[in-house]
């Protein structure tokens, strides 16, 4: 997820304030081609007429949880992000508060927290627009539709799939200091390729959201591959954070 500028943070804060007061309904209407009709929403994996093809609907509006997906079993499980330390520290799990000035992040303070809970089996997880994998790696293709992909993932065997990276200022967990440009983040592994499925441009108001519209390939620990097409971040009624993902597994 792309973020820029001190003035950018001010604009984000104003948008958040507007969101809390009025829900920002309609503010970003028309950005995505295929918003989901609210009355048709069925959270989870919605099977299609094609075998191994699903329309995945997720409510990812919260900033205080990770939503874990098991593509093998078509299972979904949410876990809250720990905000305190209740046991022995694992040596790296922290909340870090940064002052954000453009691309410069100045660490103000950090606090130790419990290790992020995870299911026994999972393949990828989402935190709002941020995405991590369970030891997997991701390739952004040049395709904008799963239907247009080559017949087999073997066609991409020579391409470079990128693994997750440890980040300290990617996953926002607390906006309360936004007006002072002070943001709390959860230190966490993140797949920066897949997390780039939606970019935010705050160079000129109002903020503009742009989806890459690309198809991503997720190579999992067992070597199997899933094709993921991030189609929308809102419902037809303008509810932000309702994600629509076209899934093909196995690919």
Describe each PLM feature range.
Residues 2-12:
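Bacterial N-terminal signal peptides that target proteins for export
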Residues 14-18:
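Hydrophobic helical h-region of N-terminal Sec-dependent signal peptides
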Residues 20-23:
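C-terminal motif of bacterial Sec signal peptides marking the signal peptidase cleavage site
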Residues 25-251:
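Surface-exposed, beta-sheet-biased, low-hydrophobicity segments with strongly acidic/polar composition
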């Amino acid at each position: 997820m792309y973020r820029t500028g001190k003035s950018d943070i001010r604009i984000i804060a104003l948008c958040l304030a507007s969101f809390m007061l009025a829900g920002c309904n309609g503010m970003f209407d028309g950005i995505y081609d295929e918003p989901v009709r609210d009355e048709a929403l069925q959270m989870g994996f919605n099977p299609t007429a094609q075998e191994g093809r699903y329309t995945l609907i997720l409510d990812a509006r919260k900033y205080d949880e990770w939503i874990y997906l098991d593509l093998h079993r078509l299972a979904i499980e949410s876990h809250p992000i720990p905000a305190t330390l209740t046991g022995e520290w694992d040596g790296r799990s922290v909340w870090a508060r940064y002052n954000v000035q453009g691309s410069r992040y100045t660490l103000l303070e950090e606090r130790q927290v419990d290790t992020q809970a995870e299911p026994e089996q999972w393949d990828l997880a989402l935190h709002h627009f941020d995405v991590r994998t369970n030891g997997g790696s991701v390739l952004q293709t040049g395709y904008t539709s799963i239907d247009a992909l080559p017949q087999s993932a073997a066609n991409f065997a020579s391409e470079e799939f990128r693994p997750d990276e440890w980040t300290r200022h990617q996953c926002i967990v607390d906006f309360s200091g936004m007006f002072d440009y002070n943001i709390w983040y959860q230190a966490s592994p993140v797949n920066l390729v897949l997390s780039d499925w939606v970019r935010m441009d705050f160079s000129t108001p109002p903020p503009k959201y742009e989806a890459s519209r690309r198809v991503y390939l997720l190579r999992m620990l067992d070597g199997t591959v899933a094709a993921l097409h991030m189609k929308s971040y809102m419902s037809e009624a303008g509810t932000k954070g309702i994600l629509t993902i076209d899934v093909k597994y196995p690919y």
